[in-house]
Structure formats: C-alpha cells, structure tokens
Amino acid sequence: MTVCNIEDCEQSKLEFLNGRRFDVLVNFMTMTFSEKILDMLLAKNTLLVNFPIEDSLMFHLDSRGTLKECMKLLHDHGHTRVGYVSTIDSMRWVNDPRGIAYLDHLRTYGFENRSEYVVFNDDYAKDSSLVGYENGLKLFRAHPEITAVFVSNDIAALGVMRALKELGLRCPEDVSVIGYDGIQIGRLFTPSLTTVGYDNVEYGKEMAKRVIERILHKAPTAEREFIFPAKLILGESVGPCLRK
C-alpha cells in the first residue's frame, strides 16, 4: 500500500505512476488525470477507483441532504449573508456537490446571492490550511458584513478561523464557520468545528471489500457505484447571527 499526495502537474503524475506497479489506484482528491495517464494505468491492468471513466469503481458520499441541513441551520440562526471559501477553482466548484448545494439553496433560505461572496483557489500546490487562511483574509477584508461561511474542507476551515482571529472577528459571535470532512482535529479546536462528516472507518471497510471482490473475481461487476450517507456534526463554530 502506498499513500501519497501527487502534485497536480502532468509530468509529476507521469513520473510517479509510470515508475510503479499498482493493483489498485484510489483517487481521494478532486484532481484530474489526462487520458494518456488513464490509458497507461489501464494498460497495466490497474483497477481504478473514483476516476471519471466507465471502468472505474465509484464511491460517493451522499452529502446533498446534509448540506441542505447546514443551510437550514444557518437560516434558523438568522444568517442571510453567507460566504464560501473554496479549495478548488471555479470551474470545478460549480460541478462539486458542495458548490451545487450552496448555489441551489441560497434563494431557498433567503440568503443574499452575490458572486463576490465566493472565493476560489487556483494554486493546487498550496496546503489547504494556507488556502483557507489567505482566502479567509481576502474574503472578510473585502466583505466584513458576511456573518457565516462555508469552507470546502475542515483543514481550510481552520485556516479561515485563524484569519478571522487576526481580523478581530470572533467565531461564532461575529462569523459562523462550517467545514467539510469531519476530521478529528476539528473537534479539538476552540471553538470546535461544525462540519459535514461520515463514518470513515465503515467507508474504508466497504471500499476495501468491494475492491478485493473485484480483484479476486477478475471480472467487472454489475454494480460500479456505491453511496455512503454523510451526517451533520455539530460543534461550537455556528451560532446566532448577532450582526444585522
């Protein structure tokens, strides 16, 4: 087993993958791979998981209902000016479940629909915490009126919370923050992070089970897509809107 973070660079991906033999390659990122790389992996009989091709096994987190629940939570707390800090670029974001849920439910819950309330990341070499920190500074310097913010992942959300502190904004008294992933470290911060998570142990077990079945049978199975439910994990980073 090899766990790695490949640079989002065509040559780096080619060099890393071409020099190794993988029975299975699981893509846990939103990273894209060229047709050349995918053809190379398929030629080596590598089983691909979470790649946007016909022969790949796909494991999805069903977070649509949970993301809507997050929007309702903010609405019930009186928030109407809700921003978004993305760790991906604008082209990917509009096709990402998190971005889709945000856009779909803005009007449903009476939030202000302003494109300038969303900031994106175009530098995939940066760590998520730095992306959250820098884009948090950028967003709240430009729009201090925002009272709640969604962040693409928990690590970036912690970066946003650091940015808020430097700007003299309190969480959640001045700004409520919601992350995504449900990582353990978010529960250890003060305030603890409200986030969208899932049972990652069961998720991993089910993925391993399906992958092993596919390898042992050495034949495609009828079922290629597997869905896992997400859940809202309430922390201390969301509170009533105190700034009207």
Model-identified regions with their sequence ranges:
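Bacterial carbohydrate/catabolite-sensing allosteric modules
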Residues: 2-24, 33-244
